[in-house]
Amino acid sequence: MSQAAVKIDRYITFEGIECDEQARRVLDCIRDCIEAPEASSWSAYFERKLDEITRMGQDELFVVGSQVNYIRALFEHHGHREGLDLLDRIEDECC
């Protein structure tokens, strides 16, 4: 059976899930949004958060998991479909 045909279940194993990579990609999507010409009320908030992550060496997956609702609001505001899809995947597979 191919890897694609197997439903990934985080309660069995994290093998093949790549949660850290997914979290890094979500942070890239956040950067896309805050660099967009159309600013949102979330821009300054996430600029500070991204600075904190770097300064404090925080775990990216932890940050994404603890900010899910705020990240979702940012992505919805910007219509960032890729970011929303990644966020849903992280919630399902990693959190």
UniProtKB/Swiss-Prot annotation:
Name of encoding gene: cowN
Organism field: Allochromatium vinosum (strain ATCC 17899 / DSM 180 / NBRC 103801 / NCIMB 10441 / D) (Chromatium vinosum)
HAMAP family assigned to the protein according to its UniProt record, in alphabetical order: CowN
Biological function: Is required to sustain N(2)-dependent growth in the presence of low levels of carbon monoxide (CO). Probably acts by protecting the N(2) fixation ability of the nitrogenase complex, which is inactivated in the presence of CO.
Top-level lineage group: Bacteria
GO biological processes: nitrogen fixation
Classification lineage: Bacteria, Pseudomonadati, Pseudomonadota, Gammaproteobacteria, Chromatiales
Family that this chain belongs to: Belongs to the CowN family.
Keywords: Nitrogen fixation
InterPro entries: CowN
Name by which UniProt lists this protein: N(2)-fixation sustaining protein CowN
